[in-house]
Amino acid sequence: KPIVIGRHAHGDQYKATDFKVPGAGTVMMTYIPADGSAPVEMKIADYGADGGVVMGMYNYNDSIRDFARASLRYGILRNYPVYLSTKNTILKAYDGSFKDIFEEVYQNEFKAEMDAAGLTYEHRLIDDMVACAMKWEGGYLWACKNYDGDVQSDTVAQGFGSLGLMTSVLMTPDGKTVEAEAAHGTVTRHYRQHQQGKPTSTNPIASIFAWTRGLAHRGKLDGNQELIDFTQALEEVVIETVESGKMTKDLAALVGEGTPYQTTDDFMNSIAENLAARVSA
C-alpha cells in the first residue's frame, strides 16, 4: 500500500541562519517583542579558542497550523490514518509546538469527520516512526517536518521500489489547489539517448500518477465521478501491469538479475492495452 509523506515545506533548516564561529566567545539569541516590552535573551553556547559552528532556525505557528490542516484533510481525501513525527523529547519547545498544534487542529476541526470515516491521528517520535515505516505495509499518511520529509520521502521511494514510483503533490491548506508532479528529475541521460534515436527504458509511472492525481482533484472540484473513476482505474492498471511482469529496467533490476524488461514505448503500449481492456469491460 502507498506511504504518503506530508512534508512541511517551510522554515527549519531551509531558512536557517548559520555561520562559523571564528574563535573564543559567546553566542546569544535575543527575542525583541514588537510591543516594546523587555527583550528575552538566551545563551546558546560558549566557544573556546578553536571556535565552532552555530545555527538559528525558526517556524511560524500559522504555518504549522496550515500544515496540520493540509495533512489531515489529505488523509481524509485518501482515506488513510495520519501520523505526525517529531523529536519533542529533545526539542521540547520547537517540536513540542508541532505536536501541540497538530493535536489542537485535529481535536477542534477534524476529529469528528475522521471518527466517522474510521480514521485515526497519532503523534509518534521520529525514530519510532521510521522503524514502523520499515515494518508496516503502508496505507497511511506520514506528516513530517521539513528536513524529515525531505529525507524520508527518498528513503521510502528507494527503499520500497524506485524514485520512478514517487509522485509529489503540493496542496494549499484549504485543500482547493494542488500541483502534482513526478518527484524525480528530468532523466537527462535517457533523453540524450532518445535524441540519438536509441530506445530507452525510462520509467513513466511517476509522470502518469502526476496526471492521475491532478485529474482526480479536478474531478473532485467539479463533482465529476466519471473522471475520478477513470484516474483510479488507470492507477490500478499501471500497478497490475507491473505485477504481471511487464516493467522498465529500473524495476527489473530490483526484482533480480536477468529479469526481462521493456522499453519505454513497449511499457506504455502494455499499459494502454490493459487500460483499453479495463475500460471496455
Describe each model-derived feature in a short phrase.
Residues 1-40, 53, 147, 151:
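N-terminal glycine-rich phosphate/adenylate-binding segment common to multiple enzyme folds
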Residues 19-27, 98-105, 159-169:
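A glycine- and small-aliphatic-rich helix-loop capping segment at beta-alpha/alpha-beta transitions
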Residues 31-124:
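Glycine-rich phosphate/diphosphate-binding loop of Rossmann-like nucleotide-binding domains
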Residues 92-103, 133-140, 147, 157, ...:
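Short glycine/threonine-rich loop-to-helix capping motif typified by GTGT followed
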Residues 126-133:
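Glycine-rich oxoanion-binding loops at beta->alpha junctions
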Residues 133-233, 240-244:
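Glycine-rich phosphate/nucleotide-binding loop
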Residues 196-202, 220-281:
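Internal helix-turn-beta structural module
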